[in-house]
């Protein structure tokens, strides 16, 4: 068993300074939770000095203050480039207090000055209407991770250090957070880190023993088991355990010196000798009481060191005078008169513990990654165009075409190493195999003879954990780089809530002038619902789009290009954009190609448009509008149009294709939305619209419910019918196929009369023929497999 480190070479005077800094941060943290006035306790505390609504989380806060104070010492001593990630981000008082003490907070918010008046404002704003949230939110300098939803701190930290060889991320992992699936998996991220070209993550597992009302698992297994667990993950654990402050200061100082020494030794060896074999990186296990230095007992019940200290220990001072008395005793226990001068400023000899300038963790430019953002070098997407010999000519698969474009983005940006591709073992499966012409999968575990495209250095990161891919990419973007997440459409749902949190982050940071814009989070969703016939029902779910459009209109964008040239145009736009979440849904299987590159670029720029060549309308309104959004819905719509034009030649048809889904919303609801007049010009004011949609049909109704002609919009899409079957049968099961679309049009056009009814009967016969054929032959009918668009239609 590893002994707790207690001896240290750090001077006793320095340890006393660290203790004073820690006490100052604790004082400011308690003040944020409780005080609305009397910030320096220049008079006895009165109930009028206490906030009427007490919010916040004390339990994790003193431990994080302890860590931050010690990191300040080691940053300054070793001139480290370091940022801080608060996994248990509900300890927001700690991050705010420390950035205030180091001065970075007041530089961004000058009205929160480093004096008594500023301190009062600091206290009042915390968890207060019109103030700041209780977590390590975007409003807090130095934060790249809010820590509200637990589990992503290590993933974000590793994303931050990829291609940042001089950066160290001190990542505090809460022992409650450590029970989440994403965090438990994230320990394996060390198998992807290259010590020669990447930075380092220093995890600090904070064992304070409790969650809201339960003990934590890692705090209740024995020392040896915990040590073996961390070693099994590939880490070298350094234990700091106890509750006596001065002994703990000594132990923590030595632990950090050992850890930083090991990191530097690992990196120096890799960079000087070329040895990139996987090292055992250090990590620290800090075991300290929950609610450390807070009230020992509250109302006769033990508080410090128990789950009772998780939030606000003394929660009712208005009704309980003893609580008010304890709050004052608690605040005065930090001896603020020793820490702050009469004006409320941290005494200089204590303030000198912290680094200065950009070395302060609250001012480090990596924590405001837009400051470091360098635009990608982009090839001309037009150079990858698919030549259109005729409308609907067969392509090789849209993502396979785009893979060559992305390959060259990798190549062009190799010098600056600021672009990466992330995916859960699906980069080849999703059609992006061309990228491996110029790069490898970065991998630092064992490599055996038959492995392909694995190397210690590469621009592709693949781990069969959507959580890690998403977290790595977010950390990479937040620190000023660019990336792409490719994923099966159905399984991107695994990161629904991670997307939610990132979209919230972008929303808030877009409202903070000091936060620079970062590159957009780009999803490429391939292997989609309509071509998962071979994997079955579990792999068929287009509902991520429903999740995405819930977020703020200023943040989210959704694109469904109908062919390869459109996909190239869309990807070029998305990879150049900043501060959005872009979701692109595209197919990987051979499919018809509709538009020349010039047409595709113009169509995608508009986001929606009439395909004149597909319809046959005259200058007046058509009899029916056939609309489509998505590659397979476009195919089925055009096949339906060809049937209608052949059998009902007098019927006038307009074909509308949608690439940018948000064009369907009113302009008042989304920046990309069409005005009512423009929408009516496309979809008419009173004609029936048969709309073939890639995802769940009610999403279109939701986006168009305010439109003049909404009552006449009839949407077909995925309605949760699926199995292992043929590609075309997937559309039949969901009434999205060409035969159903033809019948949908006829049902709403009584003027087609007997000819229409005979055509409807033919379509019903075709559906029976289809079912019989696939049941006998196991594949689609030749007229489906070999269908081609004809200009004569």
Curated annotation (Swiss-Prot):
User: Quick one: signal sequence residues?
Assistant: none
What this protein needs as a cofactor is: thiamine diphosphate
**Cross-referenced PROSITE patterns:** PHOSPHOKETOLASE_1, PHOSPHOKETOLASE_2
Single Gene Ontology MF annotation: aldehyde-lyase activity
Q: Which InterPro entries match?
A: Phosphoketolase, THDP-binding, Transketo_C/PFOR_II, Xul5P/Fru6P_PKetolase, Xul5P/Fru6P_PKetolase_C, Xul5P/Fru6P_PKetolase_CS, Xul5P/Fru6P_PKetolase_N, Xul5P/Fru6P_PKetolase_ThDP_BS
The family annotation for this protein states: Belongs to the XFP family.
- Which PANTHER family does the entry mention? PHOSPHOKETOLASE-RELATED
Q: In its UniProt entry, what is this protein called?
A: Probable phosphoketolase
């Amino acid at each position: 068993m590893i002994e707790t480190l207690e001896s240290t070479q750090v001077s006793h005077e320095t340890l006393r300074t660290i203790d004073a800094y820690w006490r100052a941060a604790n004082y400011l943290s308690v003040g944020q939770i409780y005080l609305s006035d009397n910030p320096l306790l220049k008079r006895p505390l009165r109930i009028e000095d206490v906030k009427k609504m007490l919010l916040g989380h004390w339990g994790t806060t003193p431990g994080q203050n302890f860590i931050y104070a010690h990191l300040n010492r080691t940053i300054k001593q070793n001139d480290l480039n370091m940022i801080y990630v608060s996994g248990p981000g509900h300890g927001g008082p700690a991050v705010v207090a420390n950035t205030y003490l180091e001065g970075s907070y007041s530089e961004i918010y000058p009205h929160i000055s480093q004096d008594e008046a500023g301190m009062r404002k600091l206290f009042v704003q915390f968890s207060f209407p019109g103030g700041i949230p209780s977590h390590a939110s975007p409003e807090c300098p130095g934060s790249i991770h809010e820590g509200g939803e637990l589990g992503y701190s290590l993933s974000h930290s590793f994303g931050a250090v990829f291609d940042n060889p001089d950066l160290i991320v001190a990542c505090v992992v809460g022992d409650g957070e450590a029970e989440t699936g994403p965090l438990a998996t994230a320990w394996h991220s060390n198998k992807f880190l290259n010590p020669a070209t990447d930075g380092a993550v220093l995890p600090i597992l904070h064992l304070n023993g409790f969650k809201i009302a339960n003990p934590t698992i890692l705090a209740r297994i024995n020392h040896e088991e915990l040590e073996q667990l961390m070693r099994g993950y590939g880490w070298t654990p350094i234990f700091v355990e106890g509750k006596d402050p001065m002994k703990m200061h000594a132990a923590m100082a030595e632990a950090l010196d050992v850890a930083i020494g090991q990191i530097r030794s690992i990196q120096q060896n890799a960079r000087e000798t070329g040895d990139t074999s996987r090292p055992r990186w250090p990590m620290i296990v800090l075991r300290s009481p929950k609610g450390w230095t807070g009230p020992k007992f509250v109302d006769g019940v033990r508080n410090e060191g128990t789950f009772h200290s998780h939030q606000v220990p003394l929660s009712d001072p208005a009704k309980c005078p003893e609580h008010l008395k304890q709050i004052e005793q608690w605040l005065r226990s930090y001896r603020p008169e020793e820490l702050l001068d009469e004006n409320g400023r941290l005494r200089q000899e204590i303030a000198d513990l912290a680094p200065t300038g950009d070395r302060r963790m609250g001012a480090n430019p990596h924590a405001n990654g837009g400051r470091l953002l360098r635009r990608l070098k982009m090839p001309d997407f037009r150079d990858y165009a698919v030549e259109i010999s005729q409308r609907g000519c067969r392509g090789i698969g849209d993502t396979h075409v785009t893979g060559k474009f992305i390959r060259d983005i990798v190549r062009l940006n190799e010098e600056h190493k600021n672009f990466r591709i992330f995916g859960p073992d699906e980069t080849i499966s999703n059609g992006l195999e061309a990228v491996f012409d110029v790069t490898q999968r970065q991998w630092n575990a064992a490599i055996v003879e038959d492995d392909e495209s694995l190397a210690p250095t590469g621009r592709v990161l693949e781990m069969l954990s959507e959580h890690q891919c998403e977290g790595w990419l977010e950390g990479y973007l937040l620190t000023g780089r660019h990336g792409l997440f490719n994923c099966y459409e159905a399984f991107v749902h695994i990161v629904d809530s991670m997307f939610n949190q990132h979209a919230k982050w972008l929303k808030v940071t877009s409202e903070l002038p000091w936060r620079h814009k970062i590159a957009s989070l780009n999803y490429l969703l391939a292997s989609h619902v309509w071509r998962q016939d071979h994997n079955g029902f579990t792999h068929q779910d287009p509902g991520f789009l429903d999740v995405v459009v819930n977020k703020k209109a200023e943040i989210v964008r959704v694109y469904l290009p109908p062919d390869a040239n459109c996909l190239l145009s869309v990807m070029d736009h998305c990879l150049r954009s900043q501060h959005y979440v872009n979701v692109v849904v595209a197919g990987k299987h051979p499919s018809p190609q509709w538009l020349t590159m010039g047409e595709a670029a113009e169509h995608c720029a508009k986001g929606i448009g009439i395909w004149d060549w597909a319809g046959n309308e005259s200058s007046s309104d058509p009899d029916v509008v056939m609309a489509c959004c998505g590659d397979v819905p476009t195919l089925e719509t055009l096949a339906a149009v060809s049937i209608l034009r052949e059998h009902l030649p007098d019927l006038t048809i307009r074909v509308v294709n949608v690439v940018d889904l948000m064009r369907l919303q009113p302009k008042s609801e989304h920046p990309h939305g069409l005005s009512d007049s423009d929408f009516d010009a496309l979809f008419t004011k009173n004609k029936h619209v048969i709309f073939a949609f890639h995802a769940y049909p009610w999403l279109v109704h939701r986006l168009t419910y305010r439109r003049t002609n909404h009552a006449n919009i009839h949407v077909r899409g995925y309605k949760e019918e699926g199995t292992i079957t043929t590609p075309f049968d997937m559309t039949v099961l969901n009434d999205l196929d060409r035969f159903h679309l033809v019948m949908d049009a006829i049902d709403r056009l009584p003027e087609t009369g007997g000819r229409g009814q005979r055509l409807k009967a033919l379509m019903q016969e075709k559906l029976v023929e289809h079912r019989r054929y696939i049941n006998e032959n196991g594949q689609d009918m030749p007229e489906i497999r070999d269908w081609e668009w004809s200009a004569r239609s």
